[in-house]
């Protein structure tokens, strides 16, 4: 939505929020984008809508930033639905067919919220996994990002070491890939 037409959000049944959550200089998450958007749209929200957060957030952020504000106006799980479903786009992946094959994590504040989020994403994704809570889904996203960052860091360090020893890192990775378990290549 263009912010000039933000009032049209009341026409939507499902609102997906996926805004950046960069780190501040002190390494705390910058939540101002999320805080501003919920403040901006709350007055236009109506009963029976569903908000799904896709931004990368820390555990309990959905509750702190969204649920606490929305529960003042709505009965979450009864007349308004709140879910969290982290985006899982692979950097550099541009083929939509591959995107729809990624398992989509879904969660919601109540069983009814989880059911509604699940039904929505099953229209888009072949595989949907229901997390038992929003906090599990939030932490899973952080775990996935940490796993990737640690392994990219390891790959970079191994590359530097291989360069010093005049060994081709790509040949090392190719050889390591022959192990059928416990190894995943990172470039």
For the regions a language model picked out, list residue spans one by one.
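Structural/interface elements that position substrates and couple domains in central-metabolism enzymes
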Residues: 1-187
């Amino acid at each position: 939505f263009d912010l000039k037409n933000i009032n049209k959000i009341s026409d939507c049944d499902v609102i997906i929020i996926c805004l950046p959550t960069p780190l501040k200089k002190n390494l705390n998450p910058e939540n101002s984008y999320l805080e501003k958007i919920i403040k901006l749209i709350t007055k236009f929200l109506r009963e029976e809508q569903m908000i799904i957060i896709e931004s990368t957030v820390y555990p309990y952020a959905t509750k702190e930033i969204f649920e606490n504000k929305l529960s003042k106006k709505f009965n979450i799980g009864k007349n308004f639905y709140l879910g969290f479903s982290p985006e899982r786009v692979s950097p550099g992946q541009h083929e939509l067919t591959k995107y729809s094959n990624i398992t989509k994590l879904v969660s919601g504040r109540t069983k009814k919220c989880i059911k509604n989020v699940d039904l929505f994403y099953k229209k888009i994704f072949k595989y949907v996994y229901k997390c038992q809570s929003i906090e599990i889904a939030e932490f899973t996203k952080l775990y996935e990002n940490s796993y990737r960052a640690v392994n990219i860091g390891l790959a970079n360090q191994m590359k530097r070491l291989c360069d010093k020893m005049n060994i081709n890192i790509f040949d090392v990775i190719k050889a390591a890939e022959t192990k059928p378990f416990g190894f995943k290549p990172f470039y």
